[in-house]
Amino acid sequence: MNLSATLLLAFGMSMDAFAASIGKGATLHKPKFSEALRTGLIFGVIEAITPLVGWLLGLLATQFVLTWNHWIAFVLLVFLGGRMIIEGVRGCEEASEKIRRHSFWLLVTTAFATSLDAMAVGVGLAFLQVDIIKTALAIGCATLIMSTLGMMVGRFIGPLLGKRAEILGGVVLIGIGCQILWSHFAG
């Protein structure tokens, strides 16, 4: 795979994480760049690891991975999105505005859920002549950049939406999950 194809793949794989990061950034009270970078690093590392795992699974058990990856992503994203919507509704009822950070495990779970498509791509890459390490690093770096940018975009959207930002973030995650499921069934 040439450099331009690798970069297109890398940035294509980062789009779900970008959308999720916008939602995450919008739910925080003006996240600092360090928080955006932390989120970008978590998303980027996980997005770099999942195609490697997919590649290894592709060598071992292609059919199982392709049968279940969309369901796993859908369930995780709907669960996380539902949780955000519930917290957003509760937040609308509370008057206090507090500075928050997303927990490490919440970010890891979200990053994993949005990176399962990269795992499926890794399965496919097992059958091609690619340098999987360089490809995985490109995907991870693109995701780090896009997730960090997404958090900063969310920083500006969040104050406009107020406490409804968390509800919107949850809807975005559920939408990503539905899109993953739809793309599997649509073909």
Swiss-Prot record:
Pfam families: Mntp. The chain crosses the membrane at residues 3-23, 41-61, 62-82, 106-128, 142-162, 167-187. Keywords: Cell inner membrane, Cell membrane, Ion transport, Manganese, Membrane, Transmembrane, Transmembrane helix, Transport. One of its GO terms (cellular component) is plasma membrane. InterPro entries: Mntp/YtaF, Put_MntP. Probably functions as a manganese efflux pump. This is Putative manganese efflux pump MntP. The gene is mntP.
